[in-house]
Amino acid sequence: MTVHVTGCSTATADQLVSREIRTESGQREVFCGLTGIVWLHRKIQDAFFLVVGSRTCAHLVQSAAGVMIFAEPRFGTAIMEEKDLAGLTDANDELDRVVTQLLARRPDIKLLFLVGSCPSEVIKLDLSRAAFRLSQRFSPGVRILNYSGSGIETTFTQGEDACLASLVPELPAQTDTKPSLLVVGSLADVVEDQFARMFEALGVGNVAFFPPRKSTALPSVGPNTKILMAQPFLPDTVRALEERGAKRLAAPFPLGVEGTTGWLRAAADAFGVDPAKFEQVTAPNRARAERALSAFKSELGGRRIFFFPDSQLEIPLARFLSRELDMQLVEVATPYLHREHLAEELKLLPIEVALTEGQDVDDQLDRCRIARPDIVVCGLGLANPLEAEGITTKWSIELVFTPIQGYEQAADLAELFARPLVRRAKLVA
């Protein structure tokens, strides 16, 4: 069943509680959490991500990153051969040897992540014990942690969640009694700098970003820390921070003008910023972003869009496209729907929209074909087959790689959806 949204009425609190959400469990089409290395290795500039996996794992990360291995990026793969999988060698000895060689060759590494994969988990290689053992050997010069990037029952953005959650225990305890703001989730450096300037202009002091650009500059956390989520796919990280005493601020996510304004306002209210000052600081940016967005309304307004579950960005994106660009939501599916973290977003979605958590890919493909939307947001594995059927697609992974948060990027985000439609129109003409 599909729902064709014709209005833009939003959900009240009571309707939010009673909103029907379809839950599906079946065959899925997603990348694994190893994909998160592609943006994390660029973000944490003195870290290295060592995947303990197969040649397939190595090809995935290298291809997704678009980096040739001889360029010495900050990631690599300790490839498990057949003899390792068969138990003919001691995998721990081999891992110790690889790590020793790596750290000798790359003295700039201050933080090493051992990243588990499907093969390493199949043979029950205990990377947590390996990380502890190697940390004792190489500390204090190098901190060694581990997390799982396995694709078993996960989606690709969960790699960042697992990575950051493993880093939370390393954060120093907060000693300052003044309240601090911790922005959680990887942001492009240009976006991070924009937000830092905005917080400074608002008078919100003591702001840190997690993950940091350098592992030697980890932010502190404690009971006076307020968390502002920049990405919706970090439940384990937020839970770990809350266990350290931090408190999450309820806010929409900073996509588009409305989302960015609500996100900034949540921080401003928590830090007692005067509403008049908030208006003074944000109004010029809002106006500029709204003008830039208006150029895309003629192309996107009234177009019907269908979301396959892939990145966990689906609900904030749907809110942005529906409310700011007048697109009609046929179905919005997401791999996992954290109702508490997405509560502010769900309030802003049209009441009639069909929401789906999880995926049965065959059933969802059937619904998509029946609906014949103008554009489909999906993973790479589904994009080419749908394009062959004449359905315009947008790769969901591109929405994670591209800077899309904040006022300055609102029009860039809109263009990501307009571009495939323009391309299709030119091909048909």
From Swiss-Prot:
Its cofactor is [4Fe-4S] cluster. Gene3D superfamilies: Nitrogenase molybdenum iron protein domain (3.40.50.1980). It comes from the Bacteria. The keyword RNA-binding does not apply. The keyword Nucleotidyltransferase does not apply. GO terms for biological process: light-independent bacteriochlorophyll biosynthetic process; photosynthesis, dark reaction. Component of the dark-operative protochlorophyllide reductase (DPOR) that uses Mg-ATP and reduced ferredoxin to reduce ring D of protochlorophyllide (Pchlide) to form chlorophyllide a (Chlide). This reaction is light-independent. The NB-protein (BchN-BchB) is the catalytic component of the complex. Belongs to the BchN/ChlN family. Protochlorophyllide reductase is composed of three subunits; BchL, BchN and BchB. Forms a heterotetramer of two BchB and two BchN subunits. This is Light-independent protochlorophyllide reductase subunit N. It comes from Rhodopseudomonas palustris (strain TIE-1).
